[in-house]
Curated annotation (Swiss-Prot):
Keyword entries, A-Z: Cytoplasm, GTP-binding, Magnesium, Metal-binding, Molybdenum cofactor biosynthesis, Nucleotide-binding, Transferase
InterPro entries from the UniProt entry: MobA-like_NTP_Trfase, Molybde_CF_guanTrfase, Nucleotide-diphossugar_trans
Encoding gene per record: mobA
Catalytic activity reported: Mo-molybdopterin + GTP + H(+) = Mo-molybdopterin guanine dinucleotide + diphosphate
Name of the protein described by the UniProt record: Probable molybdenum cofactor guanylyltransferase
Functional summary from the UniProt entry: Transfers a GMP moiety from GTP to Mo-molybdopterin (Mo-MPT) cofactor (Moco or molybdenum cofactor) to form Mo-molybdopterin guanine dinucleotide (Mo-MGD) cofactor.
Originating species: Nostoc sp. (strain PCC 7120 / SAG 25.82 / UTEX 2576)
Gene Ontology CC annotations of this record: cytoplasm
């Protein structure tokens, strides 16, 4: 899929985590850097929408551009701000706290965007709680409807999406949508990665 733009949202308060989720490291890599590097493997341009670009300037983010957010007003408004900069037909929207995100899944989804019905404004995974709005694709032309919804006081992705046609993306493994919202979530993901690490070589007798 050519001419794809990505938007990564890094404007949350991280109140439940107690620290900036974007800077939490998993296997030594900050989450924002991890997500942006995957986004850059799928998209020509990656925008990072955040009120605090200075927090993240030290990260290794090749090909990424910061879009300073005026204030933390929620992901829907952050997305609208980023979408206003997009020139491509499709945009990949990602949260910054997806430690199990897999580039091959995103690339497969992107490769099939040409088959999404014309009336659909988005292509997203769906689960028991509804749409997963922060790991999927949107058509640029949805911006006017999005702005109208926001101007009417809307702030919920779920409420906005229920008024529009959305294509369901097949989810090969639900775990890629796992996000780190709490210290308990972080402990789970770090424990799983630790379990995947190779065991240290046993010390030889007499060494």
């Amino acid at each position: 899929m050519n001419n794809l733009t990505a938007i990564v949202l890094a404007g949350g308060q991280s109140s439940r985590m107690g620290q900036d989720k974007a800077l939490i490291t998993v296997q030594g890599v900050p989450l924002l850097q991890f997500v942006c590097n995957i986004a850059a493997s799928c998209a020509d341009t990656v925008y990072i929408v955040t009120p605090w670009p200075e927090r993240y300037e030290h990260l290794f983010l090749p090909g990424c551009k910061f879009l300073p957010e005026a204030a933390t007003q929620g992901p829907l408004i952050g997305f609208a701000q980023g979408l206003a900069e997009v020139k491509s037909e499709w945009v990949l929207l990602l949260a910054c706290d997806l430690p199990k995100l897999r580039v091959e899944v995103l690339q497969e989804w992107a490769a099939n965007l040409d088959s999404v019905p014309e009336e659909a404004i988005a292509a997203l995974p769906h689960h028991a709680k509804g749409w997963e709005p922060l790991c999927g694709f949107y058509r640029r032309r949805c911006l006017p409807q999005l702005l109208e919804f926001i101007h009417q006081g809307g702030r919920s992705f779920q409420q906005w999406l229920q008024h529009h046609s959305v294509q369901v993306l097949s989810l090969p493994t639900p775990e890629i949508l796992f996000n780190c919202n709490t210290p308990e979530d972080l402990a789970v993901i770090q424990g799983e990665f630790d379990d995947l690490s190779p065991n240290p070589s046993p010390t030889r007798r007499g060494a």
